[in-house]
Design a protein with these regions (language model features):
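Gly/Pro-rich hinge or "lid" segments in bacterial periplasmic/extracellular proteins
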Residues: 1-41, 167-168, 172, 335
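Ligand-site clamp/hinge motif
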Residues: 5-8, 35-82, 202, 211
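Alpha-helical secondary-structure segments
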Residues: 15-16, 44-47, 66, 96-146, ...
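Structural transition elements
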Residues: 16-17, 111, 126, 143-176, ...
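Long beta-strand-rich cores associated with HINT superfamily self-processing modules
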Residues: 18, 309-335
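Ligand/substrate-recognition segments at binding pockets and active sites
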Residues: 24-26, 51, 142-143, 154, ...
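Periplasmic binding protein-like
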Residues: 64-65, 70-74, 86-89, 203-253, ...
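Extracytoplasmic/peripheral linker and loop segments enriched in polar/acidic and small residues
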Residues: 119-122, 213-222, 245-313, 335
Length: 335
């Protein structure tokens, strides 16, 4: 009855570090666990301090440039080159991390459900050149994707032809759906690459004659309703298998199915794919799933991210991980 599972109030553990000071939105500390000898290798530091600078990359770089920090969680955009220029070491990871611009098919806007119409969803995708979003949104630090959220690094990925880019056809399809004059609202978080990607998408929609306005929200607001917005951009971390991504994000009724996509054929094929252990055998079914994703205009998924982390000379074990993990037992400082 006296057990308290909060690690801040009752820091008991078998690892090399325990939580120390903690202030939400400001900082957190890990301190060496003196209660036992760490049986693994490493864990050479007395204390590790995490500092929260928010989404402002300029503030993060200022901390780097002033020597306030020894490494960053992630280096983004122009700040990759800036940290290169000051001589910090750079580590890269090729990933299946991405951003998805998705329409919520069940969302109501002024009493209607504009994105329930597949023509509207496909028109949005046809108006956007994914290569432009990679260039303007993420400084070309990655590879162009194909609007189905299965990556070439997933073992069961099926090769697909390039995404169709046809702004004139997009405008015609939007008009056919009776939505030529409808103003879309594209919502994103206020950080650099997700904001920039959404800005570039909105610009291309306007160039195609599709009205759109942008709404940019701070993180504390955006994540409250991220799965409910009618049209928004969300970043997704990689999963080891493509079937994991599709099951988590696109199967009917799943909590994280932010597109509200519900398709019986897709669900049946996904169940079949999940039952096939061999990736090469599973690929045939995955090809059908990927094609449904594109035919139904479920997401605009423009690129796969290469991700970077910088650290100052003498920091050890700080290399970037495909899912952003920091293995604190490996962190250390050169003698």
């Amino acid at each position: 009855s006296s057990f308290n599972g909060d690690p801040l109030d009752n820091p008991i553990g078998t690892g090399p570090y325990l939580p120390g000071a903690f202030e939400v939105g400001v900082m957190a500390e890990l301190v060496k666990n003196e209660g036992h000898a760490w049986w693994g290798e490493g864990a050479a530091l007395d204390k590790i301090t995490y500092m929260d600078f928010g989404t402002d990359q300029a503030a993060i770089f200022a901390a780097v440039d002033s020597g306030e920090v020894d490494m960053v969680y992630e280096s983004i955009g122009d700040f990759i080159l800036l940290m290169d220029d000051i001589g910090w070491s750079k580590s890269e990871a090729v990933t299946a991390n991405t951003v998805c611009i998705r329409a919520n098919q069940a969302a109501e806007v002024d009493g209607a459900t504009p994105y329930a119409d597949v023509r509207v969803r496909k028109a949005l995708a046809m108006a956007i050149d994914n290569a432009v979003l990679l260039e303007l949104g993420f400084n070309d630090n990655g590879s162009v994707a194909e609007n189905h959220h299965v990556s070439p690094i997933h073992p069961e990925y099926a090769e697909m032809p390039p995404v169709e880019y046809d702004p004139d056809g997009a405008a015609a399809l939007m008009a056919e759906a009776g939505m030529a004059d409808f103003e879309h609202e594209l919502i994103s978080i206020d950080d650099t690459w997700r904001k920039n990607t959404s800005d570039a998408a909105a610009a291309q929609l306007r160039d195609a004659g599709i009205p759109v306005r942008r709404t940019i929200l701070p993180g504390a607001t955006f994540w409250n309703d991220w799965a409910k917005y009618p049209l928004s951009a969300t970043d997704w971390a990689q999963r080891p298998l493509g079937v994991q991504v599709l099951a988590l994000a696109y199967r009917s009724g799943e909590p994280w199915n932010e597109s509200a996509f519900a398709n019986e054929e897709f669900d049946a094929l996904l169940s079949e794919a999940l039952s096939i252990a061999d990736a090469d055998t599973r690929r045939e079914t995955m090809a059908k799933l990927q094609q449904i994703m594109r035919d139904e205009g479920v997401v605009i998924q423009p690129y796969w991210r290469s991700i970077y982390r910088h650290y100052r000379e003498g920091v050890l074990g700080a290399e970037m991980h495909p899912t952003f993990e920091i293995h604190v037992s490996k962190l250390g400082l050169a003698a």
